[in-house]
C-alpha cells in the first residue's frame, strides 16, 4: 500500500484536501484527530499535561481547554517542545497501528507538523504539501478560528517555513483558487496515486 503524508501550514486547506481524498475512497489517518483522542480525560497523556500546565488548561467540565493550551504553548517555545515530545511518539504509534488495519491501494496520513518531524516519520512513501500564500492562510485562519493577528503570527512562526515544506514535497497542491479547481487537483493526484500503487 502506498502511504502519502499530507501536510501544509495553518490555513492552507489540508483538512479540506484530506476530506476530498476521503470522498474519493482513500482511507485517511489524521494526526490531529489522534491527538484529540489521546488527550481525553481517561488517557495517560491527559494526566501528564495537567501535571505540567496545571488546572489553567482545564474547562469547567474538567476537559482539556485546547484554546488555552494553544495560547500557552505558542507563547512559550519550551512548553511547546515539551508537549510535542510527549504527544508525537504516541501519535506515531497510533498511526502505525491504524495503518496495519487498512487494505487499500493507497492511504492519506494527514500530519500538520510533517516538515518538522520528517526524520521520525519513516513509514511514508510520498509527501504531498498543500501550499497557499501567507495572506490567504491568515485570512482563512481568522475566519475559522477567531484568533488575533498576533496569535496567528506566533503559529506561523512556530511552523516550518514554506520553503522547507516545499523542499520535502513529492507533490504540491497550490490552494489559492476556487473549490472546483482544488477538487480537480485532488482527483488528478488520486488517479496518479492509484497508478503508482499498481506498479
UniProtKB/Swiss-Prot annotation:
Main location (coarse class) = cytoplasm
Q: Where can this protein be found?
A: Cytoplasm
Q: Catalytic activity annotated for this protein?
A: 3'-dephospho-CoA + ATP = ADP + CoA + H(+)
The EC code for this enzyme is 2.7.1.24
Positions of ATP binding = 11-16
Gene Ontology terms: biological process: coenzyme A biosynthetic process
The answer to whether the entry has keyword DNA repair is: no
Question: Gene3D superfamilies attached here?
Answer: P-loop containing nucleotide triphosphate hydrolases (3.40.50.300)
Write down the Pfam families for this protein, in alphabetical order.
CoaE
GO CC annotation terms, alphabetical: cytoplasm
Its UniProt pathway annotation is: Cofactor biosynthesis; coenzyme A biosynthesis; CoA from (R)-pantothenate: step 5/5
Which residue intervals define the domain DPCK in the entry? 3-199
InterPro entries per record? Depp_CoAkinase, P-loop_NTPase
Query: What is its biological role?
Result: Catalyzes the phosphorylation of the 3'-hydroxyl group of dephosphocoenzyme A to form coenzyme A.
The family line of this record is: Belongs to the CoaE family.
User: Which PANTHER family does its entry note?
Assistant: BIFUNCTIONAL COENZYME A SYNTHASE-RELATED, DEPHOSPHO-COA KINASE-RELATED
State what protein this is by name: Dephospho-CoA kinase
Amino acid at each position: 500500500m502506498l502511504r502519502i503524508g499530507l501536510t501544509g501550514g495553518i490555513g492552507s486547506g489540508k483538512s479540506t484536501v484530506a476530506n476530498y481524498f476521503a470522498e474519493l475512497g482513500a482511507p485517511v489517518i489524521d494526526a490531529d484527530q489522534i491527538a484529540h483522542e489521546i488527550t481525553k480525560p481517561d488517557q495517560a497523556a491527559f494526566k501528564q499535561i495537567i501535571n505540567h500546565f496545571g488546572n489553567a488548561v482545564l474547562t469547567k467540565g474538567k476537559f482539556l481547554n485546547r484554546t488555552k493550551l494553544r495560547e500557552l504553548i505558542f507563547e512559550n517555545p519550551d512548553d511547546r517542545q515539551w508537549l510535542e515530545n510527549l504527544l508525537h511518539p504516541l501519535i506515531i504509534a497510533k498511526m502505525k497501528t491504524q495503518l496495519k488495519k487498512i487494505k487499500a491501494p493507497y492511504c492519506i496520513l494527514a500530519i500538520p507538523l510533517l516538515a518538522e518531524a520528517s526524520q521520525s516519520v519513516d513509514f511514508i512513501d510520498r509527501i504531498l504539501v498543500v501550499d497557499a500564500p501567507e495572506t490567504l492562510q491568515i485570512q482563512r485562519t481568522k475566519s475559522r478560528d477567531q484568533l488575533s493577528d498576533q496569535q496567528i503570527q506566533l503559529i506561523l512562526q512556530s511552523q516550518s517555513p514554506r520553503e522547507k515544506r516545499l523542499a520535502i514535497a513529492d507533490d504540491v497542491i497550490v490552494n489559492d483558487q476556487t473549490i472546483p479547481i482544488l477538487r480537480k487537483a485532488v482527483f488528478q493526484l488520486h488517479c496518479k496515486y492509484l497508478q503508482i500503487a499498481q506498479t
